[in-house]
Amino acid sequence: MSSIDKKELEKFEKISHNWWNKDGEFGILHRINPIRLEYIIEKITTHYNRHLSKLTYREELVGNMQHSTAAYALVREDASSRLTHKLPLEAEFEKMSNDISKLEILDVGCGGGLIATPLAAQGFNVTAIDALQSNIETATAYAKENGVKINYLQSTIEELDSDKLYDVVICLEVIEHVENVQQFILNLVKHIKPNGMAIISTINRTKKAYILGIIVAEYILGWVPKNTHDYSKFLKPLEIYEMLTDTKIEIKELKGLVYDPAKNEWKLSDDIDVNYFMCLGRKSMCYPS
């Protein structure tokens, strides 16, 4: 059973060259990317008990492409000096006591690589897949230009080797764009190792999400192109919980992502009425908070 929505593919293929243009159609993803990356790394390092200094990401312009391109430089806060040391994307990042390169990450629906490429630059072993060849070409070119080693594949989750398991499966802002969403999610979790985890993000199906995520974001502020989202495809956390009932996977954490207009910034929140992250793991495992 395919998860491909052909209309969605056609829509994204038209703008697939523009993933790394921070002022283009994917500009909103560039604005939320630092907090997304920080959250993902925090959850991975906590889950696998990696002892890291506080990690955040800062956006900076790099490259000399036709459009402005954005990469994310690691900012390592030294707990003793409280000084910030910025490392360029191309740098060989410090290896931790537990080598993170041994952690295999699968990014499903990677688009142009806004999440996968920075994670690979951090040192994780990343495989990233997308149904659109044009997305993979954009992602591969950007990673190559910035000296980042990563395995990009044109593939759907259904086409991926079913026997291959990963320490972390990531799927951000994707499930609201697919067909047969329950089967898609079941295929996602099949690729989680017994001690592994998954991180999903999507949009809740609430009146608040309709107003902010569609009317405001698409038609008033123009943060994303009109008709990017279909309200009927938004998912309530309870619906995902029910989809996982007959699996060995359960929801370990829900965390909201909200916009603070007073500070003009995005931040994590307990408010999951619109955008939210969901961490998944085996039912037998306790997930550290």
Curated annotation (Swiss-Prot):
Keywords: Methyltransferase, S-adenosyl-L-methionine, Transferase, Ubiquinone biosynthesis. It comes from the Bacteria. Residues 50-98 form the RPE1 insert domain. Its EC number is 2.1.1.222, 2.1.1.64. Coiled coil: none annotated. This is Ubiquinone biosynthesis O-methyltransferase. S-adenosyl-L-methionine binds at R36, G109, D130, L172. The lineage of its organism: Bacteria, Pseudomonadati, Pseudomonadota, Alphaproteobacteria, Rickettsiales. O-methyltransferase that catalyzes the 2 O-methylation steps in the ubiquinone biosynthetic pathway. Gene3D superfamilies: Vaccinia Virus protein VP39. The keyword Nucleus does not apply. The keyword Methyltransferase applies. One of its GO terms (biological process) is methylation. It catalyses: a 3-demethylubiquinol + S-adenosyl-L-methionine = a ubiquinol + S-adenosyl-L-homocysteine + H(+); a 3-(all-trans-polyprenyl)benzene-1,2-diol + S-adenosyl-L-methionine = a 2-methoxy-6-(all-trans-polyprenyl)phenol + S-adenosyl-L-homocysteine + H(+). It comes from Rickettsia conorii (strain ATCC VR-613 / Malish 7). Pathway: Cofactor biosynthesis; ubiquinone biosynthesis. One of its GO terms (molecular function) is polyprenyldihydroxybenzoate methyltransferase activity. Belongs to the methyltransferase superfamily. UbiG/COQ3 family. Pfam families: Methyltransf_23.
